């Protein structure tokens, strides 16, 4: 796999991980703006994880019969829309809808990206390469949450989600360029 493809996969896993945990760093800003308690805002992390866990297997089962490239691109688009809903949410209820949409899409993104990583890597290097791609998730906790918190503190919590959308658009462009075509997958290991 090319370095740029690997970087694209790492970045896609990074944004998924960042969205999950960054609420912790901007909880007080969200709470104040939406007029709900920090405890209620904190439940957004639980909602994300629960939706991720439930929707992941279901969405994988529903999408396995389709080509991975369009599924991944449409799923990323859904992820962007979900975060857009969060960014403009006038109240907590609308924010929850965006959060559920975002986390459902995230569950499929991470599974498809890790599956592609395995498919495009020689058997002897698969575990290592999956680990490399998954560093995006670890990096999201180490770097993504503080970045999201800084953005929230500087310009408001909504801009944190706009930042996620911008990075997601970049990932989408990279995916359009670097995701394998079906012919490449047919010849993959």
Stretches with model-predicted labels:
Residues 5-38, 56-59:
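Extracytoplasmic
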Residues 17, 21, 103-111, 142:
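Small-residue-rich segments within alpha-helical transmembrane domains of MFS-like 12-TM solute carriers
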Residues 21, 49-57, 141-142:
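Residue-level signature of mid-helix packing/kink "hotspots" within the transmembrane helices
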Residues 54-93:
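Conserved MFS/SLC helix-loop-helix module at the cytosolic interface between two early adjacent transmembrane helices
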Residues 82-87, 102, 118, 175:
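MFS-fold secondary transporters
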Residues 94, 132-177:
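Helix-loop-helix hairpin linking two adjacent transmembrane segments in secondary transporters
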Residues 98-136:
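Cytoplasmic helix-loop-helix junction between adjacent transmembrane helices
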Residues 177-189:
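Flexible cytoplasmic inter-helical loops of multi-pass small-molecule transporters
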């Amino acid at each position: 796999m090319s370095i740029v493809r690997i970087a694209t996969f790492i970045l896609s896993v990074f944004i998924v991980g960042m969205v999950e945990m960054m609420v912790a760093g901007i909880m007080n800003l969200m709470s104040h703006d939406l007029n709900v308690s920090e405890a209620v805002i904190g439940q957004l992390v639980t909602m994300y994880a629960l939706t991720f866990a439930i929707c992941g297997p279901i969405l994988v089962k529903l999408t396995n019969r389709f080509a991975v490239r369009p599924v991944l691109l449409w799923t990323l688009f859904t992820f962007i829309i979900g975060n857009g809903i969060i960014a403009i949410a006038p109240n907590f209820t609308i924010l929850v809808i965006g959060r559920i949409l975002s986390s459902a899409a995230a569950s499929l993104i991470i599974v498809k990206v890790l599956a592609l990583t395995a498919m495009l890597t020689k058997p002897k290097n698969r575990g290592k390469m999956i680990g490399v791609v998954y560093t995006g998730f670890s990096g999201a906790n180490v770097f993504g949450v503080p970045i999201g918190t800084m953005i929230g503190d500087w310009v408001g919590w909504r801009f944190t989600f706009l930042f996620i959308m911008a990075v997601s658009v970049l990932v989408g462009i990279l995916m359009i360029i670097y995701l394998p075509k079906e012919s490449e997958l047919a010849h993959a290991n």
